[in-house]
Amino acid sequence: MPKVGMREIRRAQLIDATLRSIDEAGLPGTTLASVAQRANISTGIVSHYFGDKDGLLEATMRHVLRDLWSATTRRRVAARKDPRSRLRAVVAANFDDTQVSAPVMKTWLAFWSQSMHDPMLKRLQHVNTRRLHSNLCAEFAKALPRTKAREAASGLAALIDGLWLRGALAGGPIDTRAALKLAHDYIDLLLASD
């Protein structure tokens, strides 16, 4: 008889091992066997929980996305209610510690690349993109006309992605302070122009 709660513990253990494997070996070097080895379990158990490598990557990205969405919610709730503060909260969530560790950043890069070829991952990316744009647009709409709010949201989303991508590819820890300053300056510029 399986232990109560063991399924979630085991899944979390395997997702962590997947993040570490992608960090160390990249997506091509990440196999069910490499994940099993890092988790000190059999390959059969990995297959039991995730089916195949695609299922494992999907579950790992769902985990990373949940962390992002949790950080976004937590920071928006804690922020003052004015649009500037709430926009800054959304930006900060994208540079949250849960999103800028080397294993997570490399997994994001692998996910983006793979999402161009995998319909399920493409759908996850589409949901994430829409959620970011919606959060930004809702806040900009409190201070700008609708069309300007949409344009501002698209611009800030592109800036977030660009700053994050440059940071991920820089070869060292991401300078979140510099990224946040640039994004905050952009928000201030957009809100001051109205």
Swiss-Prot record:
The gene is betI. NCBIfam families: betaine_BetI (TIGR03384), PRK00767.1 (NF001978). This is HTH-type transcriptional regulator BetI. SUPFAM superfamilies: Homeodomain-like (SSF46689), Tetracyclin repressor-like, C-terminal domain (SSF48498). Repressor involved in the biosynthesis of the osmoprotectant glycine betaine. It represses transcription of the choline transporter BetT and the genes of BetAB involved in the synthesis of glycine betaine. GO terms for biological process: glycine betaine biosynthetic process from choline; negative regulation of DNA-templated transcription. Residues 31-50 bind DNA. PROSITE patterns: HTH_TETR_1 (PS01081), HTH_TETR_2 (PS50977). Keywords: DNA-binding, Repressor, Transcription, Transcription regulation. It comes from the Bacteria. It holds the Pfam family TetR_C_6. Residues 8-68 form the HTH tetR-type domain. It comes from Burkholderia cenocepacia (strain ATCC BAA-245 / DSM 16553 / LMG 16656 / NCTC 13227 / J2315 / CF5610) (Burkholderia cepacia (strain J2315)). One of its GO terms (molecular function) is DNA-binding transcription factor activity. Pathway: Amine and polyamine biosynthesis; betaine biosynthesis via choline pathway [regulation].
